[in-house]
Every structure is written in C-alpha cells, then in structure tokens.
Amino acid sequence: MAIKVSENGRLFTLQTKDSSYQMFADDKNVLLHLYYGEKIGEENLSGLIFCTDMGFAGNPEEAGPNRKYSLDTLPQEIPGSGVGDFRDDMIEIRHADGSFAADFRFDSFEILDHSYAIPGMPALYDTEEEKGETLVITMTEKASDIVLKLFYGVFEKENVITRAARLENHGETAIELEKMLSFSMDLMYENYEMIYFSGRHAMERTAERIPVQHAKVEIGSTRGTSSHHYNPAVILCEEGAGETHGSCIGACLVYSGNFVAAAQKDQKNQTRFQMGIHPTNFCFHLEKGEAFDTPQAILSYSGTGLTKLSQQYHEIIREHICRGAYKHAKRPILINNWEATYFNFNEEKILKIAEQAQKLGIEMLVLDDGWFGKREDDNSGLGDWFVNEKKMNGSMAQLAEKIHKMGMKFGLWFEPEMISEDSDLYRAHPDWAFAIPGRVPNHSRNQLVLDMTREDVREYLLERLTTIVHDAKIDYVKWDMNRSVCDVYSHMAAQNRNGELYHRYVLGVYDLLERFLAACPDLLLEGCSGGGGRYDAGMMYYSPQIWCSDNTDAINRLSIQYGSSFFYPISTVGSHVSVCPNHQTGRVTPFRTRGDVALAGSFGYEMDLNKISDEEKEMVKEQVAAMHTYYDLTHEGLYYRLTGLKKQDFMAWEFVAKDQSRALLTIVKTDAEGNMLPVHTKVCGLAENKLYRCSLDGEIRSGRTWNRAGLTLHQVLKEYESIRVEFTEVE
C-alpha cells in the first residue's frame, strides 16, 4: 500500500517510489501539512512545527488561552477564508446571510484501491500496468452543513501524487462559492525559486525563474483558456537546483480554462504554494444537494533535479492522460497546406501537394482552414460546417477518396467553438454566441465565441463534425480555437449562474470532445489554439498531440520546445518543417536544421513541396527516413535537456532508449562569432557499464566515460546549422 495511516487515523503518509507526502489532523481537527520531499519513513513529523505568538495572529476558540496556536501561522492543507488565516486562502464561501467564512475541520477518511475520476473533467486513469490508490479525507465546515472532500491520488512508480477537491452543500440554504483551488500546501524551512512558462501568441512557454519571497509570485489566465501567456504548470525548486541536482516540486493542472498558480513566503518564512481555477469572474451557486468539483493537479517531486522531474511528468502524461487509438500507435508524418496556400486553394492545388508529398514518403495530407461555407478569408463562415463543393470541385468524400487512393491518410481542420457574424449559423441563431445584452461584443480575428455551455450548441457541432468525418472517412482532425473568451453571457443561464460560465464553457468543450471521440474512436485528434494557446494536460486527455506554436521558425522553436519539455512528453509536441524565409520571423535557416528541430516532436511539413529544390526534396526523404528510424526514441525514450536557461551559443538535447541501447543527440548552433570556439556538450543517460559507438567518428567509449567527459565537435557549425549524433551500444 502506498497510503499509510497511523493507528489513531490522524497521520497520513503517502509513499511513492522516491518521495513522501505527510499530513496530520491535530487535536483541534485542523489538517496540517508536514512534509513533501525525498522518501522517508512513517514517523510523525508534527514536531517540525514550531508554534509561537507572532502578534496580531488570531487564535481559534479551541486554543483557549494558548496564544501560540494560530491558523495564521500553521502549515495547512486546506486554508479557509475569514477565520483568522490572513494568507491567501484555498476556498471562499459566501453564506445566505451575506457572511463569508470557511473553516474546515477533519472528520474522517477512506482509502480506495484505484485512482479517482472527476465528473465531466479529465484526470489520471488506471492502466493494466499500474493502478493508482486514493485517499479521501472528509472535512466538515465548522458552523454550517458544508462538506469538503479532499482527494489524494498516488501513482507509486511514477512518483506522482494528485490533488483535487469536492465541495458539497448539505445545508438548507444556498451558498455562493467564490473561490476553490485544487490544492494548497505550506512548505516549511526552505528557500524556493519558481520556474514558470510565459509567452504570447507565436512565442509560447519561455522558461523564467525567480526567487519566492514575501511578495507573491503569481501567474495565471483569465482568457477562458490556459492561454499562450502562461502555462498551467510550475516548478518550485530549491535555490540553485539544476538539471541533475536539487529538490524540485512540480505542479501541473489538468485543466484548459482560467487558472492561477502562486507561491509566497509568510511571516514565518513558510512558502504557501497553490494552484487551481482563477477566482476572477468565478462564482458557483450551490443549492442544497449540489456540489462542485475542482480540476485535478498533478504533483511530482524530484530530489535529483529538473531532468528527473520532467521525465516523471512525461511518463505520467503519456501513460495516464493520453488516450485513444494513437496513445502508442505510430502517428503518420503529415503535410499541412496552411502555409503553402492559406485560403487560396482548390482541389487541384491540394492534390498536387499531396502527390508530391506521397512521392517523398509523407503519409497524410491535412486540409486546413477554408474548405467550408463562405470562407475565403477569416472574416466569415465559421459555424457553417458544410463543404464548399464549388471551391472543392465536389464533395469532401470525393477529395478524401483521391487522397486515400494515393496511399495517404487525410485530415481536416475545424474550429468548432467559434462563430462568424457573417455566417448562416449566426443569422439563424445569434443567441448562440457569447454577447452581453446591451453591449457590442468584442471581436478577435473578426469572430465570436459560441456558448459551449448550451446542449443545443454542442448537439449541432457533434452532428456536423461526425457527419463530415464519417462521410469522408477522415483519419485526423485538427481542432483549433483562435481567440480568447470574453463578453461571457448565456441566454440559457439564470442570472445567479453567470459566474459559472467560464468553467461551464470548459466543461462543455470537454463534453463535446468526449462524445466526438466516442463516435470516431479511430481518429487522430490534434489540438490547437492559435498554436500553443491551449497546450495543457487537460487537452492532452483528448488529443495526444497539440500544435505547439503557430511559429514554425526553427530557432524560435528551440525556446518554445525547450519550455514545453519541462512537463509535456515530446510525443505531444506538434512540430513541422516550414519554408524560408520563415512566414513568422523572416529568418532563413538551413533545411536540415528545420528538420532536426521538428524531429523533436510529432513530425510534419508546412509547405508546398512542389516549390522546393531537388536537393531539398532529397533532404525531405532523409528526414522522413530519420523520423521512422528514431520514432521510438523520440516518442517513448527518456528526454534530456543538455543546455539550459543561461545564454549559450548552441542548444542541445538528447533522447535515450529506455533500455539504454542507443541515444540520439542533436545540436543547433544559435549564434556565431569570429574565431569560433568548439562546441562541447554533455552526454547523459547512457548505461555506465555498456560500450557505445559515436556516429561522428566511430569512437567507442563506455557509457560512464561519455556521461562524464561529454562530446566535442571537431567541425565548425555555422550559425543556425545543426548536427545529429547517434550513440549505439556495442555488444
């Protein structure tokens, strides 16, 4: 059993292979956080807490004359609001009398021999290879009939602990839930730094690192999606922690909507670490008998640096989040027509692109935006999911049949959650779009957002999408979402329910995705939101790969894919070779480099292959062959970042087979200067006692030597040039 409980039922120790998490219900039934870190025994660590009178720290009634006991200074698992803890709370409730107070005390516990599910939301699931365990702790509100259930999931082998919570109103009167996070924990006696991932459209997930001090460090999104601007995954690490050393705690939210993640030192230098749904524009009305569930947060600990932490997240997301026919099945190498044609295409152009792609070994053609309704630009047509047969010279089934006869798969782009005002759908159902009565709604990309909280909207979309997919025998769908969500108002919701709409929007999207995939179980679904605007574990539950960024510039992609790698498996990274000069940056990079960067992901092309040179066509063949050669390495192997946050003149990364029989190391020169110095890089992950041959010069060394001495290139890489180096076990 990974969940250990003391004889008196008040000390809880969660054990994974390499980590321990401990909490304790004290004699006043306050649930205290004691420890999360390197694996230890089951001894009670409550002695680590030092209570002292800090002044102006309130004392609950149970403390009696003891001024040292205060919720304002204790390390808690579930800090409430309005009852004496003045730090950031985890939960805020407004009662029927207008008061706001949340003071939850320990009541009971239950242990389940399986992982827990969350109604209507994605969460880690059990497999035949590993089942999780669950601890459910029931808390009761001190002065009302409100019950809080805390869920702790343990995946022992992957060193993962999950957190989620469920609030149930058992009282006679309604309450307003104004804030409820997925987890809070108070960490004692350490100085931490936070690593988070910021960005913007076409430049997502830039890794940044700052110390956690008494001023709060907070990131989040109120855009209706997890967003390009911050990712719902952060790391707390000890000062100076690196790839192979130092304690690190990761937190990844399995959610695709508004979120917040924060860390702050308190007056005792304890660090309060929290994550969950953002409280801005959030208010859930709960009548008697109603409940609210938070999204799941995935926690993981590494005592040996960031690399191990990332590998633990890669494994848990790949094996216990990603699902469906393509969870492990080999995914086709694709070509997408978007940057080749934009909206200016017809059947003839698409078939010519497909014919050339097929000759070069590419396995699937994806037809992007512009095939439906009145859609010659981005100003009209969204919502009218009917094939423009005039533009396509026939039905989609006819085009798909021609592609299939070439021996290729065929994919199609959709943007189901959006609607254009210039569309038949909007003219028939203007109330289906989010818009506040009496206000002109904001436009973004000249489109509005459909009210995904409505069942009739989802039914329409499900019918349209499944009909097209089935009729044309579509193999792949790219599911896009090209704006942020605002002007939120539903004609189907009561006024006291409008604070629920941002969350119910996400639940509506999840519901549609679940039903769509159930109707099309063999489909490969790739997520997208203007690239990486919804690149999160919630969407990976439905789409095992996500278009990582609309920026296809190979050099910018180094930073984007570097940041993505801290939490998300390389198999989830949609990455393509595109034309040069690049359409986003104007940069010119070697064709080989573009391929090497795209190989660190779910590989494809974004160009008209009829317009490239014969030499480049040969490179396409080589890259396609390389993708097949290295597929198992890049999609299932262990990933190592060999260069870091500090500025260097090259970037390097490595994949190592799980059996350590081979490895692939890639180097890209990012900067050049006169009289250049040689490139020397680390090598990681090779078996200490095995011998490996290097593909550069045939030199054979032990894994121990390669791991410690590294590799020096004896050739000068010019700016933006790249090289792949393979290490193969010698029997």
Protein language model features and the residues they cover:
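Polysaccharide-binding surfaces and accessory modules of carbohydrate-active proteins
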Residues: V5, R10-Y21, V30-Q264, T280, ...
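Carbohydrate-binding surface patches
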Residues: E243, G644-A687
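Glycine-rich, aromatic-flanked loop segments that form ligand/cofactor-binding clefts
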Residues: S70-S115, E243-G257, S300-A325, I362-L367, ...
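Aromatic-lined carbohydrate-binding/catalytic grooves of carbohydrate-active enzymes
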Residues: Y326-E463, Y476
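C-terminal beta-sandwich/jelly-roll accessory domains of carbohydrate-active enzymes
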Residues: D671-E731
